Amino acid sequence: MALVGSRVELDADEDIFEDALETISRSPSDMATSGFHFVPCDTKRTSRQLGAPAVGRAEGSSAKVDLKSGLEECAAALNLFLSNRFKDALELLRPWAKESMYHALGYSTIVVLQAVMTFEQQDIQNGISAMKDALQTCQKYRKKCTVVESFSSLLSRGSLEQLSEEEMHAEICYAECLLQKAALTFVQDENMINFIKGGLKIRTSYQIYKECLSILHVIQKNKEEQHFFYEFEGGVKLGTGAFNLMLSLLPARIIRLLEFIGFSGNRDLGLLQLREGASGSSMRSPLCCLTILAFHTYISLILGTGEVNVAEAESLLAPFLQQFPNGSLILFYHARIELLKGNAEKAQETFRKCISVQEEWKQFHHLCYWELMWIYIYQQNWMQAYYYSDLLCKESKWSKATYVFLKAAILSMLPEEEVAVTKENVVSLFRQVDGLKQRIAGKSLPTEKFAVRKARRYSPSSGVPGKLVLPALEMMYVWNGFSIVGKRKDLSENLLVTVEKAEEALQNQNFTDYSVDDECLVKLLKGCCLKNLQRPLQAELCFNHVLESEKLLKYDHYLVPFTLFELAFLYKSQGEIDKAIKVLETARNNYKDYSLESRLHFRIQAALHLWKKPSSD
């Protein structure tokens, strides 16, 4: 179906729904006047003067901004962002945010990023308001068509070639804005209305990208006649590549459902499209690079197997490091890559530099605090880990329940006399967790739900609190930290010593309701340490102990499917691929309704994809 033909159906769904909702929704607040920026640029245009407005422009003027100026100034804005000049980027785009589609996209992205990073309700409202204005600006440039024209486009693809360059770019900008507005809609409130609104926006954005890909194929033969063909191509590659990549990560059962309603995702195709976009010289080429970097340095670890393409990540980052040696975002990725290589000390140094190079955007500091906290956990430097967890509790609003639980978990690893120095009450901290959980798109965050469940052991109703065993290492496992530690034999050996001490302590304690669960947790953690140390037979014994205790578990039922996942990778490392796949499928198909189920299904999907199992798709 051609784009102009499908728009009547797609936009009608959303517009009618949203118009009906406007009367019962809160009025959006005024657009934010400050924020931070993350929009595309051409990193090769280093000679261009950044931040210089076009001659003769003034805010409030009714003059039209041409496509060339919009593209150039959006590119300049990203250069400003990557140079830590966040407010300058905002001010460059602000005057024409209601006249130019690219200024609108860039400006609203700044405000949306502020909302996502701060998680303040007022910032979220500002972001939604800004993005709504941006959508209206983009709409002005989209092709206008009658119902008759829309119907005729169903019969002929010739209408694709009738779009002007400006109209084609308007579709790309509109799709990008829709996707961002959908993300904010999900975090705005937990009611079902917002969930449906967000879903409609994603559906519309996805359809626009599909049609833009069709347009790209049609105009390929005349690309020399298109002044901004490569810019349009870059937008298509970024959008379709990111959609394919993200959808492919979803568990198989969700993919089957989404395919039924018209979505599809292919990881290899998504990465190929992003790589093609990254290799070009369009304004969005850097964003294609940064998307791949995010996949390799974060997504593959948290929602994947932990097997990261570090070589590609380093290659992609190298030009950015040369051009923006003090850019916060670039330094952050650099530190992540060093950590994934096992260079924890170098990563610490780089994260600290990332904090020191700018004060304008404190949210970057919070990301670094999070990373530094985990590195100190890997090193078992508990006081330093506590320091950064405490900073997160005080300064960041992203996930208070997770931060407080982690702070309490870290303190639990310390002797009582050292905890006393901090003047913290560990039991009190654990009891705060339940009241701090939040909901997004009507759902509690899985990691927060996990923290709440674990913290219940300290509930006043339970009488004498039953102390958690190695809670910081359990959370480290949940966040796939053992994949990182596995690069360092010294860290793995030190962790094994700590786990074995906990194992011995459990054997000397009286039996309680928690004894089997605690013992199985320790065996899982011990097995992971042994696996990292290339001691597969001993690791397998630990994993089998957990599996044999399945019917005795009372609380931590997640331990069995997660242990099966680890056992599968143990078999894979020994060349028993068919056996490994069978174990993964057992974990996927035979267990449900346990903590962090969706996270494990993401990881199973990633593993089956890597192991080339057709039935897993």
UniProtKB/Swiss-Prot annotation:
Keywords, A to Z, come to: Lipid metabolism, Repeat, TPR repeat
An individual GO BP term? lipid metabolic process
What family is it from?
Belongs to the TTC39 family.
Query: Pfam families given for it?
Result: Iml2-TPR_39
| Main function | Regulates high density lipoprotein (HDL) cholesterol metabolism by promoting the ubiquitination and degradation of the oxysterols receptors LXR (NR1H2 and NR1H3).
Provide the organism lineage as a comma list: Eukaryota, Metazoa, Chordata, Craniata, Vertebrata
Name of this protein: Tetratricopeptide repeat protein 39B
Taxonomically, the superkingdom here is: Eukaryota
Q: Where is the signal peptide?
A: none
Please give the InterPro entries that the UniProt record associates with this protein: Iml2/TPR_39, TPR-like_helical_dom_sf
Which residue windows are transmembrane per the record?
Answer: none
Q: TPR repeats: which residues?
A: 328-361, 561-594
Q: Which PANTHER family match?
A: TETRATRICOPEPTIDE REPEAT PROTEIN 39 FAMILY MEMBER (PTHR31859), TETRATRICOPEPTIDE REPEAT PROTEIN 39B (PTHR31859:SF4)
